[in-house]
Amino acid sequence: MEALKFSNYYRKYGYSNSTYRHHEYSHDLNEAIIIIRKLIEDYKDIIKFYDLLLSLTNKEEDIKIIKDIMEDELKHNKVLKNLYYELTGNNLKEDRLNKFEDNMLNYKRNLEKGLKKELEETEKYRKIMSAMPDRRKTLSVMEILTDKLRHASWYNYLIAKCI
């Protein structure tokens, strides 16, 4: 009886047979494939960025956090390459030119840049996740998305330590 009341409440207010705000995040699979390809192509630049961060600190805790994030990025790259292959049947070549040219040697400013990048990527992963054709692929992307949110929290922590 309680479940029926709960169900009727949501039907009354227009939430039945659809996921809340689903239309905002429902995306085309082709768009998701383009985003995945771009994320894979940007991987080398991301690793260079983390190498720069490591070179700007000598704090043991900061180094451990940054290395943990780098390990997650390696895992994400493998998952994305696998997803790209499963969705397209093609492997991406990694012989592109790197565009990473950051001479900004300020640790805090680079942490802020990293935080902004992680938050921007959450939007991309949300788009990818909503376009996945099956639950296994959706869960793979969800794992990356939750890692991105965790990374953003770590960046906030490291930035706060710099103040």
Roles of regions detected by a PLM:
Residues 1-163:
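Non-heme di-metal
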